[in-house]
Amino acid sequence: MPSEHPFSDGIPTPNPKETMNDTAQITASYGRRYIVRTPDGTTYEASTRKKRVDFACGDRVRISPVNAEQVVIEDFLPRQSLLYRQDAWKTKLIAANVTQLLIVTAAVPSPSVRLLQRALLAAEAAGIEAVIVLNKADLPETALWREKLKFYETLGYPVIETRALENAGSLRPALQGHSNILLGQSGMGKSTLTNALLGSQTARTGDISAALDSGKHTTTHARLYDLNGETQLIDSPGLQEFGLHHLQAADLPRYFPDFRHLVGQCRFHNCTHRAEPGCAFKAAAQTGAASPERLAFLQGITDELPG
């Protein structure tokens, strides 16, 4: 009897005569369907047992064989990092083992300050370095957005200007040596940047995953590419919201570069940074040492979190 396809609801039992119990890295994620690559470069279609969905692009995993082309993911290996978002209803894993988040923005379509700030918070919470990419920098509409991004440079986040179709190579020095992920709203040019950086590699990887992704040109699932032996790049789907329900309200100030030095300086240890006397955060906002808008953002996120 032919083996059951691993992308059906049932998971086939590996042939006990098979000896492979190897490791691999997830290079593409499609819900409960994955593409994994072993250290020798062999690529397999992969599924999970018991409908597990707690795997992410970039995960290093243990695999067991199904046949010459298909494997089952048994578990993930210890992660260096995990980037994800969570709202009141669900959790969405974005990528694992990334060391640098590149938030791709552009003046057109209208950029979201809300999304930018939330993504920066998520990176801080996950211990991931963050870089802001100002794409389509040659557009006349860019001037105002460029000015707004200067504030984030003062917080320590580099801003790199690119024109994806002309000088995507300006990103290479920042990418080198990192496991990178491009994240941002739809239409900001993430996939165009990826194609410019990867060239023919994109087409080869697309051949592998085309059957799973319905041949769409718009990125619908995260995909990992190698830039070189030391550098990886994940292109992720566009998003409009970034839920932060996985964060703890008490930890939030430490994720704000402009407020973390004030932690512990309020008169009351349980200060909410609103009406309490002796609040160091309010004092900083009132004197101009910190942005009132950023304090309002901190308060808003605190109100949003459960508990």
Swiss-Prot record:
Pfam families: RsgA_GTPase. The gene is rsgA. Binds 1 zinc ion per subunit. One of its GO terms (biological process) is ribosomal small subunit biogenesis. It is found in: Cytoplasm. Residues 85-242 form the CP-type G domain. InterPro entries: G_CP_dom, P-loop_NTPase, Ribosome_biogen_GTPase_RsgA, RsgA_GTPase_dom. One of its GO terms (cellular component) is cytoplasm. PROSITE patterns: ENGC_GTPASE (PS50936), G_CP (PS51721). Keywords: Cytoplasm, GTP-binding, Hydrolase, Metal-binding, Nucleotide-binding, Ribosome biogenesis, RNA-binding, rRNA-binding, Zinc. Belongs to the TRAFAC class YlqF/YawG GTPase family. RsgA subfamily. It comes from the Bacteria. One of several proteins that assist in the late maturation steps of the functional core of the 30S ribosomal subunit. Helps release RbfA from mature subunits. May play a role in the assembly of ribosomal proteins into the subunit. Circularly permuted GTPase that catalyzes slow GTP hydrolysis, GTPase activity is stimulated by the 30S ribosomal subunit. It comes from Neisseria meningitidis serogroup B (strain ATCC BAA-335 / MC58). Residues 1-21 are annotated as: Disordered. Monomer. Associates with 30S ribosomal subunit, binds 16S rRNA. Its EC number is 3.6.1.-. This is Small ribosomal subunit biogenesis GTPase RsgA.
